[in-house]
Amino acid sequence: MTNPFAIFDLPVAFNVDQALLSERYLVLQKSLHPDNFVTADAQEQRIAMQKSTEVNDALKTLKDPILRSEAIIALNTGEAQDLEQKSTQDMAFLMQQLEWREELENIEQSQDENALESFAKRVKKETKEILTALEEQLNEQQWSTAAQFCDKLRFLKKLADEISQVEERLFEL
């Protein structure tokens, strides 16, 4: 696995200085711009394009808290596993997922905009709490628990997307 933190010369940490990240991204992209390689041979152009792709992938990873966390876990455990394929062992959270999906379905059927707004706020609050817990687990090097929080965040991200879709459908009416 390519270390996205190393590409931008940043410390491996959950909290990333986004302004510094953007600044370094612009510098790297400027240095790798195709115009700089017009007179270069095909191999040099291909290498520059590959590096540019690596920079873009690293940026995507560092901007997304789930991907960033998974990168930290992989770098520290040496396991480049597909964390998305792990199923959560937290039965209480599995039950909560079912309840949330049912609640969202009921809100959509009843077309209750106030209930949807309240539900969205609760999901946002839960997401913030899990992000905080994830950061703590990463700081304590509890990689397995951190991976479980990544799974929870992935679900909450999908749920937030579904809430947005329901919101769009309600406002179309």
PLM region spans:
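C-terminal accessory/regulatory regions appended to core domains
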Residues: 1-173
